[in-house]
Amino acid sequence: MALRLSSSAFTGTASGSTPPPRPVISQSAVTFHDAMRKLWEDHITWTRNVIISFEVNVPDSSVTLPDLGAALERLFQNQVDIGDAIKPYYGNQRGDQLTALLHDHIAIAGEILQAVKVGDAAAYEDANARWYANAHDIAVFLSETLDPPLGSLAEMDAMMKDHLDATTEEVVARLNSNWTGDVAAYDKVHNQALQMADMLSNGIIANFPAKFRP
């Protein structure tokens, strides 16, 4: 006996009825969504480049790859780019605030890499505590300082913690010359960064619908 399925089995509408209209997504919303993803992919790409160039598995502070300075400069520029991305919606002051917070995020991460490289446990603990405190400050900025906010403090805190935890896994894998683990950690960082980018772009699009009308 043949099994016959109508389209209503998948849409949940009665046979012959008109399905509800799908929401129309404007080209400007798609462009913004993709641009935000590009910014956060730049963030993790240049962060990874810096991690590799630090050569954390070589316990000599004088040993780094020659591209470290250029990679760091590009990574710091990415923080400016991310801050600039929210200026059309939240203004220049808020954009500059986000850039400053993200600049500290990168600067402290550099301290962590240096401490890990030379095996300075005390310096690592100090920098790591400040790194997570800075992540909380970023979460507060996204959830409380911006008006309207991009999500709850709990959501933003979890997002930032996941980002730091995944990046730490990447550093630890390289420290231990665990190249398979390093690749797996980067895949995790990449997926998490895309989720973070989507959370931010979706929040802005929802908060400023007039700027993204079809």
Question: Which role does the model predict for each range below?
Answer:
Residues 76-113:
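Mid-chain, structured segments of secreted extracytoplasmic proteins
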Residues 1-8:
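Sec-dependent, cleavable N-terminal signal peptides
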Residues 6, 16-56, 60-65, 72-75, ...:
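C-terminal amphipathic alpha-helix
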